[in-house]
């Protein structure tokens, strides 16, 4: 597998709809000229933005977190340009971008250093071959202080790995009828 460059990412987004909406360059300021956490195409990746939809963990119901029997009441829904994650807590969000991953590509997501240096960690499982949807983002605030996430700004970087022509997967995410195929919005655990 080889990592793909900005040229390849632009081509796949424009010609094959791999990322929508798509920013071909790197945006570092908003429309009023204020600095923001960057998003868009980088040398060997794509920095995604967070939408304004958030789900913040709460303990008001004192339930046990169980991925097989997940209680939707464990979250508070927030729509805002900013999400405040409580100390040592967790929030879900989604990307603005919708992805359509080719059969011969695997995408790995890494957090942005701007957030990591503040103790905010983003986790996303790999985007598998032929998966499509909005990416659900998992944010952990590892600090003893409240932490802020900004909507409509960069939050994570996607790295695109392309298989050699003789090594394309036999079974894709679509072939397996993956449970998160076509997800839109912030998607909670499914079994």
Curated annotation (Swiss-Prot):
InterPro entries the UniProt entry points to: dCTP_deaminase (IPR011962), dUTPase-like_sf (IPR036157), dUTPase_trimeric (IPR033704)
EC numbers: 3.5.4.13
Entry keyword Chloroplast: no
Pathway: Pyrimidine metabolism; dUMP biosynthesis; dUMP from dCTP (dUTP route): step 1/2
GO biological process: dUMP biosynthetic process; dUTP biosynthetic process; nucleobase-containing small molecule interconversion
Source species, domain of life: Bacteria
GO molecular function: dCTP deaminase activity; nucleotide binding
Reaction catalysed by this enzyme: dCTP + H2O + H(+) = dUTP + NH4(+)
Any single Pfam family the record assigns to this protein: DCD
CDD domains: trimeric_dUTPase
Keywords: Hydrolase, Nucleotide metabolism, Nucleotide-binding
Binding site for dCTP: 112-117, 136-138, 157, 173, 183
Active-site residues annotated for this sequence: 138
Subunit organization: Homotrimer.
Record family assignment: Belongs to the dCTP deaminase family.
HAMAP family, sorted: dCTP_deaminase
Role this protein plays: Catalyzes the deamination of dCTP to dUTP.
Protein name stated in the entry: dCTP deaminase
């Amino acid at each position: 597998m080889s990592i793909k460059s900005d040229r390849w990412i632009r081509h796949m987004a424009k010609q094959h709809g791999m990322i929508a909406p798509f920013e071909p360059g790197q945006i570092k300021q908003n429309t009023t000229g204020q600095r923001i956490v960057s998003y868009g195409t980088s040398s060997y990746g794509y920095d995604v933005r967070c939408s304004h939809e958030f789900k913040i963990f709460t303990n008001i119901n004192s339930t046990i977190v169980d991925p097989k029997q997940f209680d939707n009441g464990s979250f508070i829904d927030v729509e805002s340009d900013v999400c405040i994650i409580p100390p040592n807590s967790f929030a879900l969000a989604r990307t603005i971008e919708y992805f359509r991953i080719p059969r011969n590509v695997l995408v790995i997501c890494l957090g942005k250093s701007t957030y990591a240096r503040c103790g905010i960690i983003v986790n996303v499982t790999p985007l598998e071959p032929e998966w499509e949807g909005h990416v659900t983002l998992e944010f952990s605030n590892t600090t003893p202080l409240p932490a802020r996430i900004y909507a409509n700004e960069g939050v994570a970087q996607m790295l695109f790995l392309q298989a050699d022509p003789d090594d394309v997967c036999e079974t894709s995410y679509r072939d397996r009828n993956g449970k998160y195929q076509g997800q839109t919005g912030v998607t909670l655990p499914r079994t």
